[in-house]
A protein has these predicted regions:
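Flavin (FAD/FMN) cofactor-binding and adjacent substrate-gating region
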Residues: 1-9, 76-82, 106-120, 124-187
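Extreme N-terminal leader/targeting segments of oxidoreductases
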Residues: 1-27
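N-terminal Rossmann-like FAD-binding beta1-loop-alpha1 element of flavoenzymes
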Residues: 25-52
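Glycine-rich FAD pyrophosphate-binding loop
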Residues: 45-65
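Glycine-rich active-site loop/strand segments that organize a redox cofactor
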Residues: 65-95
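Active-site substrate-recognition segment that forms the wall
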Residues: 102, 110-118, 205-207, 213, ...
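Helical element adjacent to the flavin cofactor pocket in flavoenzyme catalytic cores
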Residues: 140, 166-227
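C-terminal catalytic lobe of FAD-dependent flavoproteins
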Residues: 297, 301, 305-307, 312-421
């Protein structure tokens, strides 16, 4: 259930040893996803001795099994950020979000990472309210000099990019796109290792002993002593997450489907320009055609702790509703796993007085943004905390409900799904 198509096709992916011995470092990073590996690369390039401790395998979490969508900016409307900040700080926050895709593309080129990058993204509107939301987004972004949007007014415009009649219009965005995320992550890890970072798999941290230095107790009886610690595990930090983190993050189970490779003709009928697509619903569908011409379709999330073991029928129905031509296509793989969300869907940045840094809650928007967040954490340690300090000014609410917060979240999302269905 947890193995993605990326793992299946990337059989020769690198592996890393478990931590073999105790050692002293400048920075210890818990979590070998895009955030942690990005931070490690930036720190190693600046000359910091850095170790990454991954409890399982690199890419076993959301960084290695997501839908592969590369998106600009922050997950929610920028208004939710700018209203809490001065105009000067809002500009810094905007620039930080917009740096994410540029950072990714620069690293792909610099380190020659083979991860199937493709640019072109369709924000698809299911009804008039969605088009109004996209029009507002276009106006806001273009007021800040974003120049990658083309408004699609109806079916004739849509036909150039998508073979579906499910939508009334959309925004085509040449500044976003898609990649094979596991290949990108391992390419980034290789670059971090070459820069001098140490990466260890199967090295879970059971406890952080505060002090100077901090001591991380790792499986196998080893200890890492570090001046600075970064918590980059997002939804996978149950044993070592800080109280100010855990109450501001909710775990959501997200699912993705991969079809068998489509014929060249069928793939071209469905997505003629190869763009990635996401609709504007709260419980959205998102999809793309990968480098092997598989349809990679996401759109089934669980906001409760009920364990659903077979999401394939639901995922197939959702895909066929958009593309009737795929109703009978053979499914190769379906997988699920946890992601972390915040109340406002904006990532939560923080730092303790004794230099434990963290970021969490990319809310399904982390393929590019998590790498940028990792660089922001690293930059703060290196000496430029400008972007990091602005983002940690944002207020992040505690999820309501206390011990009942999971059913409360599920109930709230049921309302949003009904709202999507009724097109309210």
């Amino acid at each position: 259930m947890y193995q993605s198509i990326y793992e299946t096709e990337f059989a020769a992916r690198p592996s890393y040893d478990a931590l073999p011995e105790s050692r002293n470092v400048d920075v210890a990073i818990i979590g070998g996803g895009l955030t942690g590996i990005s931070a490690a690369l930036t720190l190693a390039e600046a000359g910091f001795t850095t170790v990454v401790l991954e409890a399982g395998q690199i890419g076993a979490g959301g960084s290695g099994r997501n839908g592969g969508h590369v998106c600009q900016g922050w997950p929610n409307d920028f208004f939710h950020i700018s209203r809490q900040l001065s105009p000067e700080d809002a500009d810094i926050a905007w620039d930080a979000g917009m740096a994410a895709v540029d950072l990714m593309t620069t690293r792909i080129e610099t380190h020659k990472i083979d991860c199937e990058p493709h640019f072109g993204y369709l924000h698809a509107a299911l009804h008039k309210r969605h088009m109004a939301e996209l029009d507002a987004m276009q106006a806001e972004w273009e007021a800040r000099s974003y120049a990658h949007f083309t408004r699609l007014k109806g079916q004739s415009d849509l036909d150039a990019h998508i073979g579906s009649t499910a939508y009334v219009g959309g925004l085509y965005d040449t500044g976003c796109g898609h990649i094979q995320p596991l290949k990108y992550l391992h390419g980034l890890a290789g670059a971090a290792m070459r820069a001098g970072a140490q990466i260890y798999e199967n090295s879970p941290v059971s406890r952080i002993e505060r002090g100077a230095p901090k001591q991380l107790h790792v499986a196998g009886g080893h200890t890492i002593k570090a001046r600075i610690v970064m918590l980059c595990g997002n939804a996978y930090l149950a044993d070592v997450g800080l109280p100010q983190m855990t109450h501001r993050l909710a775990e959501v189970v997200s699912s993705v489907l991969a079809t068998k490779p489509l014929s060249e003709n069928l793939a071209r009928q469905i997505l003629p320009t190869g763009a990635a697509v996401a609709d504007c619903n709260t419980a959205l569908n998102y999809y793309r055609i990968d480098g092997s011409r598989r349809m990679i379709f996401g759109g089934r999330s669980s906001y409760s702790k009920i364990n659903f073991t077979n999401v394939t029928p639901n995922m197939r129905r959702r895909m066929a509703a958009v593309f009737p031509l795929l109703e009978d296509v053979e499914i190769e793989q379906v997988w699920s796993g946890k992601i972390g969300i915040t109340v406002n869907r904006i990532p939560h940045f923080g730092r303790t007085v004794d230099d434990i840094y963290f970021v969490q809650g990319f809310s399904g928007h982390g393929v590019a943004l998590s790498g940028q967040a990792g660089r922001m954490l690293a930059d703060a340690v290196i000496g430029d905390a400008t972007q990091f300090d602005v983002m940690r000014k944002l207020n992040h609410q505690i999820f309501p409900g206390g011990p009942l917060r999971t059913p409360a979240l599920a109930l709230g999302m049921a309302w949003y799904k009904l709202r999507d269905y009724l097109r309210l």
